[in-house]
């Protein structure tokens, strides 16, 4: 039996994570003799606690061990299992990532301007979760921009060292409908 692929492991892990209200965000495997690694990134609408991650890690380890014993998985001579949350440098590639980071600053590129990085605060998602409100401050004035998620690339949460203004945070917490009614066209 070959070393398991990330897709195979994701299929095994999905029900375990879903039972706890979590999503499998990423699975990476590295086969390196006695130093093989399985790295699993999980997240949820409520950030998982370290206790929950520890419990999940133990359960995953037991599942992998049982499947190795049954001959359905083969990690080779041994492996290191790492279970954690994605971290701030994880790309925002699904609507749930945008929803979970509402109010945070994001660096992103528009599909038609791939070489240009823009920065905005993440607002609400549309009801169908296909568009997001992006908030910028221009001369102390709030500007709403509505973008379809499919038109955004290289989106990553920006680390902030200063507290954003109350006005900007309040704008980020407005409903999508409010943001859409008050949005500027891109030519503004």
Swiss-Prot record:
A matching Pfam family: RimP_N
The secretion signal range is none
Where found?
Cytoplasm
Mind telling me which Gene3D superfamilies this protein's record contains? RimP-like superfamily, N-terminal
Spell out the protein name for this chain. Answer: Ribosome maturation factor RimP
Q: Which residues form a coiled coil?
A: none
Query: Any idea which UniProt keywords this protein has?
Result: Cytoplasm, Ribosome biogenesis
Q: Which PANTHER family match?
A: RIBOSOME MATURATION FACTOR RIMP (PTHR33867:SF1)
One Gene Ontology term of the biological-process aspect is: translation
Query: What cellular-component terms does GO give this entry?
Result: cytosol
Q: What does this protein do?
A: Required for maturation of 30S ribosomal subunits.
Instruction: Tell me which family the UniProt entry assigns to this protein.
Output: Belongs to the RimP family.
**Superkingdom, taxonomy of origin:** Bacteria
Instruction: Write down the InterPro entries for this protein, in alphabetical order.
Output: Ribosome_maturation_RimP, RimP_N, RimP_N_sf
């Amino acid at each position: 039996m070959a070393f398991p692929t990330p897709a195979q492991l994701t299929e095994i892990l999905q029900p375990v994570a879903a039972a706890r209200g979590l999503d499998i965000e990423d699975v990476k495997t590295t086969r390196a003799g006695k130093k093989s690694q399985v790295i699993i990134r999980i997240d949820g609408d409520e950030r998982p606690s370290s206790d929950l991650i520890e419990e999940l890690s133990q359960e995953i380890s037991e599942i992998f061990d049982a499947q190795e014993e049954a001959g359905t998985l083969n990690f080779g001579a041994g492996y290191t299992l790492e279970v954690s949350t994605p971290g701030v440098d994880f790309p925002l590639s699904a609507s749930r990532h945008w929803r979970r980071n509402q109010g945070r600053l994001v660096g992103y590129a528009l599909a038609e301007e791939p070489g240009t990085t823009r920065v905005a605060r993440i607002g609400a998602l549309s009801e169908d979760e296909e568009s997001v409100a992006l908030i910028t401050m221009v001369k102390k004035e709030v500007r709403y921009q509505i973008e379809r998620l499919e038109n955004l690339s290289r989106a990553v949460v920006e680390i902030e060292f200063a507290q954003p203004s109350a006005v900007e945070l309040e704008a980020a917490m407005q409903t999508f409908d409010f943001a859409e009614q008050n949005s500027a066209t891109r030519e503004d």
